[in-house]
Amino acid sequence: ALLKNPYDVIHSHYWISGKVAMPVAKELNIPLVHTMHTMARVKNLNLAEGEVPEPMIRVQGETQVVAAADALIANTDAEAASLVSLYEACPDNVLVVSPGVNLKVFTPGAGRAAAREIVGLDKDSHTITFVGRIQPHKGPEVLIRSIAELVSHSPHLRAKLIVNIIGGASG
C-alpha cells in the first residue's frame, strides 16, 4: 500500500513504532520524524524508590531511533535538552512543538453546563484533575500540597472541590 500511495513523511510515536518506521523510511526514501513522548533514560534518572528501571532494549531502541530520525519532536525545551544530552541527538534536528488544544475549535458541543451534567458534576463545583503516570517527576504531590494549601486558606472551598487523580505506573 505504501508503494502505491507514497507519503511525504513518516511520523512515528514511541520507540517501538520508531523501530518499525526506520526500515520503511529508509526503503522508501521518506524522511522519518519521531516523537518520543517518554524516554527511558529520563525515566531511569527519576525512579522512585522500588521502581523498576526501563529495560536496556528500550534504551538501545530509543538510541537507534534518535540516530535514524531526520527530525525529532519534543514537547518542551527540557525534553529537547534531554534528547541532545542523553541521546546525543543533533540539536538542529530537534524541534519543540508544545502540545495543546485550540479551544475555539474543540469545545463541549452543548456547553460547559451540559458537559458537567453528562459526567455528573455539580454545576457549582470546582474540579481539578491530574492525568498521568503516578511518578515523582510528574508532580502529583505538587497538586496534593497545593490543594491542601488552597483549602487551608479558603476552607469554604472544601465543600465544592472535586479532585481527580487519574493514572498508574508506567508500562
Model-predicted regions and their roles:
Residues 25-45, 73:
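Active-site proximal beta-strand in glycosyltransferases
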Residues 10-11, 67-76, 95:
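A short beta-strand/loop micro-motif in the catalytic core of glycosyltransferases
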Residues 101, 159-171:
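Glycosyltransferase donor-sugar binding loop
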Residues 122-138, 144-148, 163-164:
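Conserved donor-binding/catalytic core segment of Leloir-type glycosyltransferases
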Residues 107-121:
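A short helix/loop element that forms part of the nucleotide-sugar donor recognition site in Leloir-type
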Residues 40, 53-72:
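Membrane-proximal helix-turn-helix segments that form the acceptor-binding/catalytic region
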Residues 2-17, 21, 30-33:
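Short N-terminal targeting/anchoring amphipathic segment
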Residues 78, 100:
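Carbohydrate-associated surface elements
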